[in-house]
Amino acid sequence: MPKYRSHTTTHGRNMAGARALWRATGMTDDDFGKPIIAVVNSFTQFVPGHVHLRDLGKLVAEQIVASGGVAKEFNTIAVDDGIAMGHGGMLYSLPSRELIADSVEYMVNAHCADAMVCISNCDKITPGMLMASLRLNIPVIFVSGGPMEAGKTKLSDKIIKLDLIDAMIQGANPNVSDEESAQIERSACPTCGSCSGMFTANSMNCLNEALGLALPGNGSLLATHADRKQLFLDAGKHIVALTKRYYEQDDVSALPRNIANKAAFENAMILDIAMGGSTNTVLHLLAAAQEGEIDFSMTDIDRLSRKVPHLCKVAPSTQKYHMEDVHRAGGVIGILGELDRAGLLNRDVSNVLGLNLTQTLEAYDVMLTQDEGVKQMYAAGPAGIRTTKAFSQDCRYPSLDTDREEGCIRTREHAYSQDGGLAVLYGNIAADGCIVKTAGVDKDSLTFRGPAKVFESQDEAVEAILGGKVVAGDVVVIRYEGPKGGPGMQEMLYPTTYLKSMGLGKSCALLTDGRFSGGTSGLSIGHVSPEAASGGLIGLVQDGDFINIDIPNRGIVLDVSEAELAARRETEEAHGDAAWSPKGRERQVSYALRAYAMLATSADKGAVRDKSKLGG
């Protein structure tokens, strides 16, 4: 029988000092011996997805205490990628993921906590906490802050749905008036919550449901809706039961590595492909798998991407549907139900409730369940009132979206495309692979050939795009923006956004060793591995070189002879210490970022630390 970790600090005369300090936090004699459960919050006033989390840890903690545990809350940092976008702040976004994972490990191990409830929401916070959970391998339940309501405004006598990306595109479009741009800006992000499309934050919160580490509804139930409160209460109650299953019943199936095993990781990736999730999810799943010592790689993602159809289309791939519409159609469980009926899921998986896949679908799939309470939960809708408060409204749709032929979620037979929403491409320029969000690519652009326009930084590319130096047919190549080369693997949302603003969104391609925001669409290919700073071929591309992109056949090739590439490599390596670094780029890089760069791996490994450099 495993021993409660917390007994290290609560039992024995030699721990009198530790107990004295525990007493100073409010613990009593009756508490020593109960499981100590960390409530890992991420409240901050910097991020709309986290601005409403201040009091939600208390909800979880009260339920933990009522269920027989001891709750101790602490906070992590949280970076808003949208606010950090387009300037030096974006260098810190991906490295913050490692910092969050480390800080959770530090707090939980330093104080010998027995289990965790992770209150996450936005882009790097959920992945960082997920990495920590699999690293620590103690009982955990995730409950996120929930999605933002979609923005809505009236333009040309028509009500349209909006999100952050619309504000960015229209703000850079010279054909949009200042008045219209301001109107869109004020309407795009109306409430607290993670941005309303299938961007990185919502993608990751959905994947946590598929991994089995979050409760049904977690990925899609709006932050503002009163029903979401129950998820926090249930997380507090169920984490105590989950913890006792492991420590008091020796049930190892309660541990995250046994819930989020390889089969669950495959299901999560299948879900991601089917819903056209953010390409960042590939990076984060690979990183989490490494922390959990799970054999899951780009090879698995490539294999899965070839057989999974695109069943759910959401902004930014369409403006018709946002997360509130996904929820109305049955949320994550609704998509999993269609995937299961298509015979695409691993069925031998479980979740933190102890339910297997069949039981979960019977209870929570709106196409199967007879539970009116579950149907009511999925009918939870937006109120359309600007607010930063959680659980502030209880509006409901008059009916669910169960149209699986033309609705938000579709059957395999009526899929948006028989090819999934993500694809892995290989070729000489990406020997270890690169990622494209096919859900956002125009059908006419699935094959593309064009001359390269090469830039050593995102900033240089943006200046050229807005300056009219990029024309239809070009392949914009942005390099030295990978985990090492950036450092920090910036998101290239501004270049893709400005290509759209300049009318080039469907006539140009963009290729980078950096990454993309979940809000990116168009022929945007990222995560090129190996990156330029690691000697990748992308570092040898020259202006005018032709690049062939073939998404249906999963290929990407720099059309330059092997002899010429060998000569270019020899010339580059002759630069010695200055080889494989950006030419003429001036960028202030702090020591914190330099430390990250020294240990960072390329994107095909999840951009995690190279453990071999640490003796691992």
Curated annotation (Swiss-Prot):
Top-rank lineage group of the source organism: Bacteria
Cofactor(s) it depends on: [2Fe-2S] cluster; Mg(2+)
Entry GO terms, CC: cytosol
Co-factor binding details: Binds 1 [2Fe-2S] cluster per subunit. This cluster acts as a Lewis acid cofactor.
Gene: ilvD
Subunit annotation: Homodimer.
Gene3D superfamilies per the UniProt record, alphabetical: IlvD/EDD C-terminal domain-like
InterPro entries with a match to the protein in the record: Dihydro-acid_dehy_C, DihydroxyA_deHydtase, DiOHA_6PGluconate_deHydtase_CS, ILV_EDD_C, ILV_EDD_N, IlvD/EDD_N
Record's catalysed reaction(s): (2R)-2,3-dihydroxy-3-methylbutanoate = 3-methyl-2-oxobutanoate + H2O; (2R,3R)-2,3-dihydroxy-3-methylpentanoate = (S)-3-methyl-2-oxopentanoate + H2O
Protein role: Functions in the biosynthesis of branched-chain amino acids. Catalyzes the dehydration of (2R,3R)-2,3-dihydroxy-3-methylpentanoate (2,3-dihydroxy-3-methylvalerate) into 2-oxo-3-methylpentanoate (2-oxo-3-methylvalerate) and of (2R)-2,3-dihydroxy-3-methylbutanoate (2,3-dihydroxyisovalerate) into 2-oxo-3-methylbutanoate (2-oxoisovalerate), the penultimate precursor to L-isoleucine and L-valine, respectively.
Matching PROSITE patterns: ILVD_EDD_1, ILVD_EDD_2
Name of the molecule in the record: Dihydroxy-acid dehydratase
Modified residue annotations for N6-carboxylysine: K124
